[in-house]
């Protein structure tokens, strides 16, 4: 179904039904939508939504807890040839406990067979998301679906042998005991409404294999600090860096051995210097200077019994780096584009205020803070969806304006208004910000 959600093109609702889990669910639009659609004059639609919502003992409209798989929608993206961004299950949660793991695997097989699309998955069930996507058994289930397409695909859907072979290769380049390689076109995200849910869900997201990791902070109900999960920028842009090491100042945490090796390799005496060093880091897509970085097992420091070592990254040359280890010593590491992607942290942050009856205002300072955090990071894109039904009021009311209810927030310079109806209030400080994550190629 074509979508009016600003950050997607299409919704793929092969699951219906859900349950509230945190206060971000209090104004859930899907409950109201399901209640309307259960009375749709089209019997097919009415049947699909029947029994999903009811009024509880307090009179509140709520989910019944029933989860329904709509089988004839599961393969729909295979019929969409034009590339598009697809929001997976806006009317449910793919990782709800009652969604069969076989259905999740079948959905991932469909995603693997349609690399022209980008799939946007969003969940509040962070624990099951991590458990499923880190499971070697789940990887084998997805591969089974891919190897048996002739047994389950509808007759009208055509998948070429080459298309299937590419999908199988993408997912099978792994040891049998390892989780599935991330699908390059699957963006895995969690919902975050305040700092508590950020602290709860984001660590699980970062521990989940994903090509793109993102959060939806909508409705945003409080201030959120994401800097712990964002990569820092390099200390200077190459163009602004000094040309000699004499002018360069190393942070105290950089080990002396690392300084000596880097300054020797990038010596001005052979036409190099800090400017060339930073440009090399930029050209090779290196991790950010000072970013927390975990070594690949094959690159552990000499003499170390640990399979993996974590420290702060310092670029050396090409795809080679050094680590400032917690004890002050130097370690060795390297990277591929895939490793950078996996350790980058959050790639995308979507922010929006709440809409609908009883909606709660979003303070503009909360949104501004997230915007500024993204802009200060190395690679986290920011998408501002909307203020919500509470939004800045116009400076003047003129004849034939709609009715306004004005409220002056004591800690802002703006008057705010509550207005239901068409929503185009997507400017933050006069700017429309609709960034998408930088998509990295799949590196094996």
Q: Where are the model-predicted features located?
A:
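Short, surface-exposed basic-aromatic patches at helix termini and helix-loop junctions that form
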Residues: 134-139, 206-210, 372
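Conserved Radical SAM active-site core
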Residues: 1-16, 20-22, 26-185, 195, ...
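Active-site-proximal loop/turn and secondary-structure-junction residues that shape catalytic pockets
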Residues: 92, 125-127, 192-194, 219-221, ...
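Auxiliary Fe-S-binding modules of radical SAM enzymes
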Residues: 2-13, 37-40, 44, 173, ...
């Amino acid at each position: 179904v074509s979508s009016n959600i600003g950050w997607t093109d299409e919704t793929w609702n092969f699951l219906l039904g859900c349950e509230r889990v945190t206060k971000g669910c209090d104004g859930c639009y899907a409950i109201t939508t399901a209640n309307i659609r259960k009375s749709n004059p089209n019997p097919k639609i009415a049947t699909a939504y029947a029994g999903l919502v009811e009024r509880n003992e307090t009179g509140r409209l709520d989910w019944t807890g029933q989860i329904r798989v709509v089988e004839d929608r599961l393969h729909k993206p295979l019929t969409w040839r034009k590339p598009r961004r697809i929001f997976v299950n806006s009317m449910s949660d793919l990782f709800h406990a009652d969604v069969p793991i076989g259905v999740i695997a079948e959905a991932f097989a469909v995603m693997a067979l349609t690399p022209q699309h980008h799939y946007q998955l969003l969940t509040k069930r962070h624990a099951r998301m991590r458990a499923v996507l880190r499971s070697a058994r789940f990887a084998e289930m997805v591969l089974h679906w891919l190897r048996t397409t002739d047994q389950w695909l509808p007759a009208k859907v055509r998948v070429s042998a080459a298309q299937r072979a590419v999908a199988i290769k993408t997912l099978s380049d792994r040891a049998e005991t390892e989780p599935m390689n991330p699908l390059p076109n699957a963006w895995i995200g969690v919902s975050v409404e305040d700092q508590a849910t950020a602290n709860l869900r984001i660590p699980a997201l970062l521990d989940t294999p994903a090509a793109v990791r993102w959060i939806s902070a909508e409705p945003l109900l409080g201030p959120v600090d994401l800097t712990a999960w964002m990569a820092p920028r390099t200390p200077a842009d190459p163009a602004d860096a000094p040309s000699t090491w004499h002018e360069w100042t190393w942070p105290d945490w950089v080990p002396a051995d690392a300084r000596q090796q880097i300054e020797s390799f990038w010596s001005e005496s052979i036409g190099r210097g800090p400017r060339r060093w930073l440009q090399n880091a930029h050209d090779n897509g290196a991790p950010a200077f000072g970013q927390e970085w975990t070594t690949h097992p094959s690159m552990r420091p000499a003499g170390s019994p640990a399979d993996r070592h974590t420290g702060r990254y310092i670029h050396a040359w090409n795809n080679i780096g050094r680590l400032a280890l917690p004890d002050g010593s130097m370690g060795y590491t390297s990277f591929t584009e895939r490793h950078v992607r996996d350790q980058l942290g959050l790639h995308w942050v979507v922010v929006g205020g709440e809409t609908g009856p009883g909606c709660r205002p979003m303070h503009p300072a909360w949104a501004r803070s997230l915007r500024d955090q993204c802009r200060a990071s190395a690679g986290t894109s920011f998408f501002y969806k909307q203020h919500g039904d509470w939004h800045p009021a116009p400076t003047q009311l003129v004849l034939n304006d709609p009715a306004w209810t004005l409220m002056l927030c004591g800690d802002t310079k703006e008057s705010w208004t509550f207005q239901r109806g068409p929503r185009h209030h997507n400017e933050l400080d006069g700017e429309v910000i609709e960034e998408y994550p930088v998509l990295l190629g799949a590196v094996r």
